[in-house]
Regions:
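The alpha/beta-hydrolase serine catalytic core
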Residues: 11, 121-225, 230-258
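The serine-hydrolase catalytic nucleophile loop
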Residues: 37-50, 207
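Catalytic nucleophile-loop/oxyanion-hole region of alpha/beta-hydrolase
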Residues: 68-94
């Protein structure tokens, strides 16, 4: 795997991998994969998506979101606007040709923002437990008065988990509120969309996926609810569903008779 470092206009430097489409394909796209919050682009899902792209001659672009991975030391400096600027630069300037954005959790929010921003270039969107507006929902559901007091006083609050400790800043929450999608009557994107969502997701209300589908202005939208799947969507059966969803983005000539 060939990775490089890139310094984005937002000032953050992070790793990315860009595999261009097979030149023999008359019609192709590059799938831009955005990972989840406090995660990275190297887990099973992106590896399987990468494999699918190579098998089908499609391009593949994955990257570390600012403040994550090799840039983790600068996490507290980042906001949703930082992440949005980054994916807009990737889709708008770094990747040639047509794009399908794919995102897990936070990455789904970013991929959808990019689809709305570049509707002519982004031909499709794949949401994997896509979590638009998750900061607002998290703030409303879990922030008790004492949390809000700490946030107001210190400008940030620390949350320890079993795996890691992360910091939420006032700027992060404010920027999330500047980029809400689900509070709008419609999400102005008409491209092909596939949404996969586990119904045993402990991090995200599974009804988020049907709500996204309802608000999208396009008609080629499918939502797959996986009754026994969790937020990670990393089981063998989940991966099989992801591959089936990816197949839907291939041009008809690739699968005659469909």
């Amino acid at each position: 795997m060939s990775e490089s470092f890139y310094t984005y206009k937002c000032g953050h430097t992070a790793k990315y991998e860009y595999i261009k489409p097979d030149g023999a394909k008359t019609q192709s796209f590059t799938l831009v994969y955005a990972h989840g919050f406090c995660s990275d682009p190297y887990g099973r899902k992106p590896e399987e998506i990468r494999k699918w792209c190579i098998e089908n001659g499609m391009g593949f672009f994955r990257y570390e979101i600012a403040g994550h991975g090799s840039d983790a030391a600068r996490f507290e400096e980042t906001t949703i606007n930082t992440y949005k600027s980054q994916i807009f630069e990737i889709v708008g300037e770094m990747v040639d040709g047509d794009v399908v954005t794919a995102g897990a959790s936070l990455g789904g929010w970013l991929g959808l923002l990019a689809a709305v921003q570049f509707p002519q270039k982004v031909k499709g969107f794949l949401g994997l437990a896509a979590a638009p507006d998750f900061l607002k929902k998290y703030f409303e559901a879990y922030f008790r008065p004492e949390h809000k007091e700490i946030l107001e006083r210190d400008g940030k609050i620390t949350f320890p988990t079993n795996d890691f400790t992360y910091v939420i800043t006032k700027e992060m929450i404010a920027s999330g509120n500047e980029n809400l999608l689900l509070d709008k009557e419609t999400i102005p994107y008409a491209g092909k969309t596939r949404l996969l969502q586990g119904m045993k997701d402990a991090s995200l209300d599974w009804r988020t996926a049907p709500l996204i589908a309802q608000k999208l202005t396009g008609s080629d939208v499918k939502t797959v609810l996986l009754k026994d799947s969790n937020h990670r969507l990393g089981s063998d059966s989940d991966i099989a569903e992801i591959r089936r969803a990816l197949d839907d983005f291939l041009v008809p000539a690739v699968h005659p008779g469909r």
